[in-house]
UniProtKB/Swiss-Prot annotation:
Protein name, per record: Dihydroorotate dehydrogenase (quinone)
Record pathway: Pyrimidine metabolism; UMP biosynthesis via de novo pathway; orotate from (S)-dihydroorotate (quinone route): step 1/1
Membrane-topology annotation of the record: Peripheral membrane protein
Top-level taxon: Bacteria
Cleaved signal peptide residues: none
Organism expressing this protein natively: Salinispora arenicola (strain CNS-205)
Record: residues binding FMN: A68, G69, M70, D71, K72, T92, S147, N180, K214, T242, G267, G296, Y317, T318
Lineage of origin: Bacteria, Bacillati, Actinomycetota, Actinomycetes, Micromonosporales
NCBIfam families per the UniProt record, alphabetical: PRK05286.2-5, pyrD_sub2
Catalytic site: S183
A biological process from GO: 'de novo' UMP biosynthetic process
Family in the record: Belongs to the dihydroorotate dehydrogenase family. Type 2 subfamily.
List of residues binding substrate: K72, N117, R118, M119, G120, F121, N180, N185, N243, T244
Length: 338
């Protein structure tokens, strides 16, 4: 395939293999394409796929979405549906602009089909994203999700107000909102998965738009069950399972050094655990809570198995980095009839 033979090797060589430089280059190029209707039409003709379904009241052209983190500030929004994605999630965005953690903070583990990141919610802030979305022609053509996180400078006891600030700024633009309380790269953030913190946060956010909670794969099942009790009691629209993991199981020998970098691991080694969490959530809620499955989807079969585990929708990030847009179409084709 063109992507795997030409595009990926070229990107992976940029600036001596700097993964974040390649990421930024790719998003800039896609942002340029997003301003070229003829180019978008060509991409849609090649990669577009129709497998519609309705989940939490939203109509999705197909059930394969772009995960948060790929286009944090929404720079290339019109390009992603043209590459076949049935929905797009931007962010994670915070109330305050922040630079994130020092570079280098993004590392590819190619033999394992994985990535380690410790980005730290680098983004231009909720206000800047709102201004960008306000200037875009609408509708986008696919549902737009917005992932919300806590600003690093905000103490945990003020987290609710911090999330509310972002939500209010972006409420009219997002079709759904993902509450990210599970990134391992913001100190103390995962404490917001605890019952009391999560209950207060959801009480402040649930209502007008569908709210989803993104959970960590590292939580034991009793903790996930407790989290789900809060989600059901507060009427969330769904769960995103899962975020990146702190575990390093399943890495190829050649990737051990890269795997030792601090941060969250995504990609193929996460597949089994992410699918286990999806299956547990599905069982624990008797299928009442829609699940967006994400983690380790690098082949169409991975997508099919995620749907079989109970996911209504899936998202790609690391698999897209390694396989390109052909994976989007193939993953959508692997979706089972809901």
């Amino acid at each position: 395939m063109l992507f795997e033979r030409v595009v990926r090797p070229t990107l992976f060589r940029l600036k001596g293999g700097d993964a974040e430089a390649a990421h930024e280059f790719a998003v800039r190029r896609l942002a340029g394409l997003a301003r070229m209707p003829a180019a978008l039409a060509v991409l849609r003709a090649r990669y577009g796929v129709s497998a519609p379904r309705t989940v939490f009241g939203l109509r999705f052209p197909n059930p394969v979405g772009l995960a948060a983190g790929m286009d944090k500030d929404g720079l290339a929004l019109p390009a992603w549906p043209a590459l076949g994605f049935g929905f797009v999630e931007v962010g994670t965005v915070t109330a305050h602009p922040q630079p994130g953690n020092p570079r280098p903070r993004l590392f590819r583990l190619p033999d394992s089909g994985a990535v380690v990141n410790r980005m730290g919610f680098n983004n231009a802030g909720a206000g800047a994203l709102a201004a960008r979305l306000a200037a875009l022609p609408r509708p986008l053509g696919v549902p737009l999700g917005i992932s919300l996180g806590k600003s690093r400078i905000t103490p945990l006891e003020e987290a609710v107000e911090d999330y509310q600030t972002s939500y209010r700024a972006l409420r009219e633009y997002g079709d759904y909102f993902a509450v990210n309380v599970s990134s391992p790269n913001t100190p103390g953030l995962r404490e917001l998965q605890d019952r009391a913190h999560l209950d207060a946060l959801l009480a402040a956010l649930v209502g007008e738009k569908p709210i989803l909670v993104k959970i960590a794969p590292d939580l034991p099942e009793p903790a996930i069950a407790e989290l789900l009790e809060v989600c059901l009691a507060r009427g969330v629209a769904g769960v995103i399972a899962t975020n990146t993991t702190l575990a390093r199981d399943g890495l190829a020998p050649a990737d051990q050094a890269g795997g030792a970098e601090a941060g969250g691991l995504s990609g193929r080694p996460l597949a089994d655990r992410a699918r286990e969490v999806v299956a547990f959530v599905h069982r624990e809620t008797d299928g009442r809570l829609p699940i967006v499955g994400v983690g380790g989807i690098v082949t169409p079969d991975d997508a099919g198995r995620m749907f079989d585990a109970g996911a209504s929708l899936v998202q790609l990030y690391t698999g897209f980095v390694y396989r390109g847009p052909a994976l989007v179409r193939a993953a959508a084709a692997a979706a089972r009839t809901p």
